Amino acid sequence: MRFSPTFFLLSQLRLTRRRAATSSRFYAVSALNNPNNLSDSEQQQVNHLNLSKLTQHGLQRLLNSTRDDPNLALSFLRQLKEHGVSPNVNAYATLVRILTTWGLDIKLDSVLVELIKNEERGFTVMDLIEVIGEQAEEKKRSFVLIRVSGALVKAYVSLGMFDEATDVLFQSKRLDCVVDIKACNFLMNRMTEFGKIGMLMTLFKQLKQLGLCANEYTYAIVVKALCRKGNLEEAAMLLIENESVFGYKTFINGLCVTGETEKAVALILELIDRKYLAGDDLRAVLGMVVRGFCNEMKMKAAESVIIEMEEIGFGLDVYACLAVIDRYCKNMNLPEALGFLDKMLGKGLKVNCVIVSLILQCYCKMDMCLEALEKFKEFRDMNIFLDRVCYNVAFDALSKLGRVEEAFELLQEMKDRGIVPDVINYTTLIDGYCLQGKVVDALDLIDEMIGNGMSPDLITYNVLVSGLARNGHEEEVLEIYERMKAEGPKPNAVTNSVIIEGLCFARKVKEAEDFFSSLEQKCPENKASFVKGYCEAGLSKKAYKAFVRLEYPLRKSVYIKLFFSLCIEGYLEKAHDVLKKMSAYRVEPGRSMCGKMIGAFCKLNNVREAQVLFDTMVERGLIPDLFTYTIMIHTYCRLNELQKAESLFEDMKQRGIKPDVVTYTVLLDRYLKLDPEHHETCSVQGEVGKRKASEVLREFSAAGIGLDVVCYTVLIDRQCKMNNLEQAAELFDRMIDSGLEPDMVAYTTLISSYFRKGYIDMAVTLVTELSKKYNIPSESFEAAVKSAALKAKRFQYGE
């Protein structure tokens, strides 16, 4: 009996499946995909198929016979390509038709993406669609073409080929096939995400020509696109013509995202009156409003919406609360974040690990690592589930505090709680050990990772070689570097940079330069690393020279390092040049850099440049911090420009930045010096100063801020100059009773007044007390005391 070659091939494929040792239905598929899964006899049978000699006609018959087993068809086609056989358009059409009929969308998408990428396929994608239409049964033709066309649209979109995806819609119409509106919506939505608004609007206007009927989701996508483009009026008109709850929700979100949250609130109120919004839809849009107000820095408005949501029966929305806390933390306004959290906890908010991690990270970013640890323990004691992200913040805080051994103990605690450490957790601890110079312990952790079946990634190795380099272990660095090149993960530009910076930090500048010279590929990033490296080595002038030669944008961290190094060494003009270059390359300097530069300008009384930089910060959306506001206010007070100082004081309060004792003291000191008793000004100005000083003191007291030594000294000085020595002494005693230690300035302010008024005994008592407190020999004061006493007596008796 004779058998056709096609029958023989098919029987061999099925025979392989029947002989499988497992009962899994798809064993043959996995075996064909991975020949290593086959036994020797099975592999021999597959090799005997002679796929390379199979004709296109035979291939077609074989594929048709697998229509009841799409996985087998897919595997067979892959085997063909592995044997160098290029399936023609008919073979692909058959496979696509089979996958479509079975509804295997993910596999279909994969095949089509692979097909689109293959530029040597020998046919166009539209040829494929036409053949599929010809092959399909008449009653299934429309169904198959719609599914395939929709899948093609998605495949092109996934590759960012929007023109080709749009072309599929028109070509399908030519074949009397109208693509499902869902595929068109998918295309339009991705156009929006990629900013291709013009292309989207053109397609939207041609929907009727394509035979497509837009649904509410189509209109919502167009509304979203128009909002992103800033065409709010056009979006509103489109929405009025095609009202839907989904469309309104999209429009409201667009208003909130574009800084028009107040308009969004007005629209929501109107829709509530029309009974158009209620339930979950209302809750969703109110959440959008909260996020919108947060983005616009209208934090109290955001908080009021959350309270409103609770009062109308929605309860506390954890995601809305999260948005408020997140914004406070991003602005480094930790007191407000904690205050809001406490209020919400009082109302029954269930805190999750995301909120905890935001709070802890904010502490660390503000260099309050000790406080972060205390808060971590507090949250842990509240039985809040803390994930590995929260633990990692604690690891990082302990490492920065030099308590890496405690971090390791915390790792054991995390394991005991059933939380499996990940690569990031180990990397943080490795970094902590390196910071303390305990490189052996860091290497032990690498071994532990590998022993637990965890592969250190490139970031882990970068942290390790950086730590070794910073501790001067040049040979070990180069050994690991060579191993990475040989075994992986391959070193990248970051690896090279951290080695250069690390060696410079260890004062091995020559070795760093030699390492750079040895690199086969030198990138701009590595050259920029020398700017940071020279700064680490205390060579800021050399770093600046290297910086000037680099005529391209650098990492922000490079600018920051150079800027602060120049400031520390007093090269303020060069530091200002760094800021200017950042601005030229549109690199945002950040609040700390601008604040530092403003402080430097203020110390030089160059308040004009300070104000220009201050205004630039605000224009860029960078809210100056308390330090920056205070030093600007102090400078204006020192230059007797009180109106500008007062304007800044009010501005900081409006932005939600609470003045501290230093800010209040700066203003109080200036106002008190306007008092006519100080003999600095006329009586009218003096009365104004007296009134404003009283206002500051009242506000100071209402804020619940305790006086510090400087503030007490200012008040003591005022009483002394008004000859109210008894009240000055009372203030001095009150300062001590409050637990504060008077400093040298506070003592000398009162002592000099006692001498001036002839209260020699009281002055000598304070001098003796001061001598004992600062452990200064009394002989050092004796001459000064006698001289002061003699002058006082002569003054007293008119000599």
Swiss-Prot record:
It is found in: Mitochondrion. PPR repeats lie at residues 145-179, 180-214, 215-250, 251-278, 282-316, 317-351, 352-386, 387-421, 422-456, 457-491, 492-522, 523-553, 555-589, 590-624, 625-659, 660-695, 708-742, 743-777. It comes from the Eukaryota. Keywords: Mitochondrion, Repeat, Transit peptide. Residues 1-27 form a transit peptide. The keyword Mitochondrion applies. Its main location: mitochondrion. Signal peptide: none annotated. GO terms for cellular component: mitochondrion. Belongs to the PPR family. P subfamily. PANTHER family: PENTATRICOPEPTIDE REPEAT-CONTAINING PROTEIN GUN1, CHLOROPLASTIC, PPR_LONG DOMAIN-CONTAINING PROTEIN. This is Pentatricopeptide repeat-containing protein At2g26790, mitochondrial. It comes from Arabidopsis thaliana. The lineage of its organism: Eukaryota, Viridiplantae, Streptophyta, Embryophyta, Tracheophyta.
